[in-house]
């Protein structure tokens, strides 16, 4: 993507328009025409930046992926940071449900898993390379992604705070397991 500030502003407007369009219905019911109307850009401008609505939604979710990685590695109160992140996810649940399946698959699920795995592996290796680091890093990523996906799709009950506490407990247990 371009570093041009005008392009960044256009992408930000498209992201906001997408979240606005999905405020009361799922991503699958939203059209490019509606998003471009809300963002006040042409279809041609849309397609200069994104291939389709799914690509726009993944782009709009990039900040969520960074925030998730940071939340799991917060130095202060990780469960509280995770609860805040889950609260933010629930505000745009219609977008995120369209990008992450109930089992954690889909473009957002894959992005979350990959980024979380990479960061967990880096953090574990700061302490020294251990046999099983790759497995633990993958398990941490899968746990976070799977629980968040299950919660988004109504398969994991609880408030953002309760689910954050459960995720944190599982992640800590995984890191202690080898």
Question: How does the language model describe each region?
Answer:
Residues 8-19, 23, 28-32, 37-40, ...:
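An amphipathic alpha-helix adjacent to DNA-recognition modules
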Residues 18, 60, 64, 68, ...:
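Hydrophobic recognition helices of helix-based DNA-binding modules
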Residues 30-31, 97-99, 108, 160:
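Short, hydrophobic secondary-structure boundary micro-motifs
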Residues 71-75, 99, 124, 151-155:
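Secondary-structure edge/capping motif, primarily at the C-terminal ends of alpha-helices
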Residues 83-84, 103-146, 161, 165, ...:
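Amphipathic alpha-helical packing segments from all-alpha helical-bundle domains
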Residues 1-8, 127, 177-178:
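N-terminal intrinsically disordered/low-complexity leader segments
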